[in-house]
């Protein structure tokens, strides 16, 4: 695995550095771009890490510029990493619809044509990118949390429940909560994973919550006026958490929709939540 990368940009932000970087990914076989916010504390030693996984159509840039994370990350001394949501470029399979292909990797490793050669976002986010950043930036490998929005919330929850020993905290904003029973999920799983329903289950946070849960507390925020509630299916995850007696908090936020205005509004709560658990 190559650990080389190039700097695209670095900007001062709340006393820290918001950087954008590019590297050649072995997982996807393409160049990949990612962003890291390093708080001022990173000048003095390793800092805890919060992975932020973005939603459909997003790149690394959307949350970096719209989620309002930097101010709170600086205050609580935590780094935030913003990966891209899929491989991109010529020769990479795509689809005319917004919710499949480039910008819609769904945080799975595709096994089906034409997606399998490049769409390995599970491996990229959980193995390749961590190795690169922990070997090149002042980040504490033993203090990792993960969060995300929409498709990224789905990714954060499934990854945390699969690797609970690695991610000491988890939260989500309006996650796609039951993808194997939603049009945001069935279409993508069929395309990327084929008929392997066991693989579908491994990437469904409601099913994972029923079967294994998470050893710590979980924080979920969901806008009650979200225009995609029927696709997100938050009630399925809420019921699974209740049936399991999963420690945590599931908040329906009155009047909030699915936008980054919603994410901004509760970003401070989420970063504080992770900072308290990552120490």
UniProtKB/Swiss-Prot annotation:
Gene: fghA
Record keywords: Hydrolase, Serine esterase
Protein family membership: Belongs to the esterase D family.
Catalytic activity: S-formylglutathione + H2O = formate + glutathione + H(+)
Protein name according to UniProt: S-formylglutathione hydrolase
Disulfide bonds: none
Organism lineage: Bacteria, Pseudomonadati, Pseudomonadota, Alphaproteobacteria, Rhodobacterales
GO molecular function terms attached to this record: carboxylic ester hydrolase activity; S-formylglutathione hydrolase activity
Record's signal peptide: none
Residue numbers annotated as active site: 150 (charge relay system), 226 (charge relay system), 258 (charge relay system)
GO BP field: formaldehyde catabolic process
Pfam families: Esterase
Function in brief: Serine hydrolase involved in the detoxification of formaldehyde. Hydrolyzes S-formylglutathione to glutathione and formate.
Taxonomy, superkingdom: Bacteria
EC number per UniProt: 3.1.2.12
Gene3D superfamilies, per database record: alpha/beta hydrolase
InterPro entries per UniProt: AB_hydrolase_fold (IPR029058), Esterase-like (IPR000801), S-formylglutathione_hydrol (IPR014186)
Coiled-coil intervals: none
GO cellular component, one term: cytosol
Enzyme class: hydrolase
